[in-house]
């Protein structure tokens, strides 16, 4: 029987979560969904000084917005301390680990001497028990660390699903501290215990974890566990070619929501940020899950391109359901001071959305319907509301008032009749109408705008001429 696929996302809640971070959730989520497996969320919160509840909330909020549903969790490492201590003791009992009494000062001096000799700084195994080796008495009053007995000689080898075969000599690895003097376990040890207990089969994570992998594999093997498949994703770079980070100006995932991006656009963009399916650029979440595999993960760093994300967002806005878009855009309109009353918002969205890259831009255009009475610039009024044009405006108002149906086509016909009667070009009449009705010179098609404003509002505002 084939083993059930189990993947995990294991963020540290020490800051906000950006696109590069959330990609390490999206890919294992998609792989688990494609393989009919399980996706687990684990919060690695052992860095007590830097971990915050706010950061945990942001992780959960970001995943909820993108609808990256989990099958198990969230599990918190701080709630599993007893389990880690239990395994540390098992390793001590089975002589897989040992107590090391070397002080910080002694370790610093050792490393300094190694550097001076041109050697790689590392622990020298002084307190490591070996057959025939006589250890000194433990110094009084010193709380030891616990070190893992890393294999001596040989290599750690694994076939990374992204990077290919990787081989690290065990001579490059010293005996890792797995528990501090106060008994708290260290990061690499907790990760191994969690992955074994949670039966993780595939570890899909950023390539900043490659250096941790040989140590984790050695501990897994010492504990008799099965080594998972590792897939280390290349770094995501910002526009300047630097590693994406808060320090280098990266937005948190929730920041894209707040700027008016749609989750489906962000996911589509993330899908292509290090993975490809032929030349396909636009595809749904369901298509991505169907197509996703580890074989087509990119090996080179992926660079963030805001123009590409904006293009995708524009696509999803254009094809999006107008009722849903109206619900999502309403808060942006209200944030601009608009009152959504009068013109039907769903119809307004349908009219204005096609050129918008974000819901914020949709809201900014839609504001012409919801900002209240128009306050046109006096200079513009003087330029466009001339004595010459007023008779045509009055004739248009008469035509509009007599329309049997307030429909765009009928409004357009009324304009054409007045233009023909007065020998005018469309801009000569449309500009003052825009100023009077909308308070601005730039709007979508004037007949569509007037239809949405409604007959009463249009006639009342034209009367101000």
UniProtKB/Swiss-Prot annotation:
The keyword Amino-acid biosynthesis does not apply. Its EC number is 6.1.1.17. One of its GO terms (biological process) is glutamyl-tRNA aminoacylation. It is found in: Cytoplasm. GO terms for cellular component: cytosol. The keyword Phosphoprotein does not apply. Pfam families: Anticodon_2 (PF19269), tRNA-synt_1c (PF00749). A motif ('KMSKS' region) lies at residues 243-247. A motif ('HIGH' region) lies at residues 11-21. It catalyses: tRNA(Glu) + L-glutamate + ATP = L-glutamyl-tRNA(Glu) + AMP + diphosphate. GO terms for molecular function: ATP binding; glutamate-tRNA ligase activity; tRNA binding; zinc ion binding. SUPFAM superfamilies: An anticodon-binding domain of class I aminoacyl-tRNA synthetases, Nucleotidylyl transferase. ATP binds at residue 246. It comes from the Bacteria. Keywords: Aminoacyl-tRNA synthetase, ATP-binding, Cytoplasm, Ligase, Nucleotide-binding, Protein biosynthesis. Gene3D superfamilies: 1.10.10.350, HUPs. InterPro entries: aa-tRNA-synth_I_cd-bd, aa-tRNA-synth_I_codon-bd_sub2, aa-tRNA-synth_I_CS, aa_tRNA-synth_I_cd-bd_sf, Glu-tRNA-ligase_bac/mito, Glu/Gln-tRNA-synth, Glu/Gln-tRNA-synth_Ib_cat-dom, GluQ/Sye. Its main location: cytoplasm. Catalyzes the attachment of glutamate to tRNA(Glu) in a two-step reaction: glutamate is first activated by ATP to form Glu-AMP and then transferred to the acceptor end of tRNA(Glu). Monomer. Belongs to the class-I aminoacyl-tRNA synthetase family. Glutamate--tRNA ligase type 1 subfamily. This is Glutamate--tRNA ligase. It comes from Cupriavidus metallidurans (strain ATCC 43123 / DSM 2839 / NBRC 102507 / CH34) (Ralstonia metallidurans).
């Amino acid at each position: 029987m084939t083993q059930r696929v189990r993947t995990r996302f294991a963020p540290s809640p020490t800051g906000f979560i950006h696109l590069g971070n959330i990609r390490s959730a999206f890919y294992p989520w998609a792989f688990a969904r494609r393989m009919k497996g399980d996706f687990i969320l684990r919060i690695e919160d052992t860095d007590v000084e830097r971990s915050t509840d706010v950061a945990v909330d942001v992780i959960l909020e970001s995943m909820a917005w993108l609808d990256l549903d989990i099958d198990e969790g969230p599990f918190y490492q701080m709630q599993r301390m007893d389990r880690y201590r239990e395994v540390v003791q098992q390793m001590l009992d089975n002589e897989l680990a040992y107590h090391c009494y070397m002080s910080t000062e002694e370790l610093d001096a050792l490393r300094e001497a190694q550097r001076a000799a041109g050697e790689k700084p590392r622990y020298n195994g002084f307190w490591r028990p070996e057959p025939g080796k006589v250890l000194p008495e433990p110094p009084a009053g010193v709380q030891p660390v616990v070190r893992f007995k890393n294999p001596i000689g040989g290599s750690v080898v694994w076939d990374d699903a992204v990077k290919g075969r990787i081989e690290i000599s065990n001579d490059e690895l010293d005996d890792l501290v797995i528990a501090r003097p106060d008994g708290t376990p260290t990061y690499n040890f907790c990760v191994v215990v969690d992955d074994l207990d949670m039966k993780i089969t595939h570890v899909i994570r950023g390539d900043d974890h490659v250096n941790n992998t040989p140590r984790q594999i050695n501990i897994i093997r010492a504990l008799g566990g099965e080594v998972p498949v590792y897939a280390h994703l290349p770094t995501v770079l910002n526009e300047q070619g630097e590693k994406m980070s808060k320090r280098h100006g990266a937005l948190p995932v929730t920041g894209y929501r707040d700027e008016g991006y749609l989750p489906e656009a962000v996911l589509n963009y993330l899908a292509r940020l290090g993975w490809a399916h032929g030349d396909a650029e636009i595809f749904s979440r369901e298509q991505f899950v169907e197509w996703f595999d580890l074989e087509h993960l990119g090996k080179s760093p992926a660079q963030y391109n805001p123009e590409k994300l904006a293009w995708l967002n524009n696509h999803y806005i254009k094809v999006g359901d107008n009722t849903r878009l109206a619900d999502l855009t309403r808060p942006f309109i209200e944030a601009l001071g608009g009152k959504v009353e009068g013109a039907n918002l769903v119809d307004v969205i349908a009219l204005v959305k096609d050129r918008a890259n974000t819901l914020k831009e949709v809201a900014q255009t839609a504001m012409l319907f919801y900002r209240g009475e128009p306050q046109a610039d006096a200079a513009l009024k003087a330029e466009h509301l001339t004595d010459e044009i007023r008779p045509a405006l009055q004739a248009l108002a008469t035509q509009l008032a007599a329309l049997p149906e307030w429909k765009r086509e009928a409004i357009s016909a009324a304009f054409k009749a007045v233009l023909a009667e007065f020998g005018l070009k469309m801009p000569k009449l449309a500009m003052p109408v825009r100023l009077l009705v909308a308070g601005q010179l730039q709007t979508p098609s004037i007949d569509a705008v007037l239809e949405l404003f409604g007959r009463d509002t249009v006639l009342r505002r034209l009367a101000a001429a």
